[in-house]
Amino acid sequence: TQSSIHTEAYEKSVDLYNQGEYLQAFHSLLDYLNADFRTKYGNTDGTEFHIPHGSILVHISVKDGFYRISADFLNLPEKGRVAMLRQIADLNLNKLLLPRFVKDNDKLRMEYTCSLSQSHPHKMYFVLQNICHIGDKYDDEFCTKFGATRCYEPQVTSYPQEEIDRIYEGLQILGRETLEAVK
């Protein structure tokens, strides 16, 4: 399958940032990640986005000269919440780099805020990557280990069976050819 990443859009994003065109730079960064993000998940002004990623929904808002990025993570369980919060504190200190976990009643979310002028595309890419990685890596573990529940159910879109068969056959051929080459 073809990658949804467009490298020229990243370079354009950096150029736009260096010219002080911060919102356009962020739009280009989103285009780099996936050309459909802005049209599928953004508002017409390009100042608000709600992008699904696995079991989290990443909310991005541009308002009053700031980016606000947040993602609801999990609902805290009745039992085991103290132990879970200890592990969340560890993630806050050791795994989340710029974003942080925030407790809002019985809900945990990751959030990050910065001014438009401090939003270099490289930094914003890693902020989004960090939020998505932590959301992917720890949601199942905390649901299983502590009984937490998801704030957002993943939207899974399956590939058509013929696409699955084509990819599987391609991998089988690649494996056979590789084994033949190393004999």
Show where each model-derived region lies:
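Short, internal acidic amphipathic alpha-helical interface segments
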Residues: 70-105
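N-terminal non-globular leader segments, chiefly Sec-dependent signal peptides
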Residues: 2-11, 114, 161, 168-171
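Short amphipathic C-terminal alpha-helix that caps PH/PH-like domains
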Residues: 124-138
